[in-house]
């Protein structure tokens, strides 16, 4: 009964924290992917000069910025005068958006790095594993899309 608002508040704050951590990790993955594309050579030239890969990295950047923006909005809503339902909707939207960004940015980073991305020597694989775990924490993006729709 009376504890429910406190539990909802704690859950929403936890979801924002998990989402923010994921956004930070995604931005590192993007940065490392761009750096790698400048040094990895194929056909005698850096793969970062290939327009198709530039487009993919631009899409990764867009996904990171979308996720960052909505997480900031959700964090701001937690300290606002919005109703509990509005706060929960903002948080669910953020977790949903971050879940989609995790899939998009994570998979692109792994593909651009190639097989080396999943070795223990390269930290992109570690980041990918971490963001995958963060996506599943407190319900994945699909769950929060349904949660948002139900509110």
Where are these predicted regions, by residue range?
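Alpha-helical interface subdomain recognition
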Residues: 9-151
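Long, acidic (Asp/Glu-rich), low-complexity accessory segments flanking structured domains
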Residues: 1-5
């Amino acid at each position: 009964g009376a504890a429910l608002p406190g539990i909802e508040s704690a859950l929403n704050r936890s979801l924002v924290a998990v989402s923010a951590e994921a956004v930070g990790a995604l931005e590192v993955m993007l940065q490392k992917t761009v750096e790698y594309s400048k040094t990895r050579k194929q056909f005698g030239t850096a793969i970062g000069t290939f327009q198709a890969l530039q487009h993919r990295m631009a899409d990764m950047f867009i996904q990171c910025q979308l996720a960052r923006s909505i997480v900031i909005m959700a964090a701001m809503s937690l300290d606002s005068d919005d109703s509990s339902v509005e706060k929960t909707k903002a948080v669910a939207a953020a977790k949903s958006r971050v879940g989609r960004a995790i899939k998009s940015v994570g998979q692109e980073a792994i593909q651009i790095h190639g097989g080396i991305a999943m070795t223990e020597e390269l930290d992109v694989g570690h980041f990918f594993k971490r963001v995958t775990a963060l996506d599943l924490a407190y319900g994945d993006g699909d769950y929060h899309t349904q949660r948002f729709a139900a509110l």
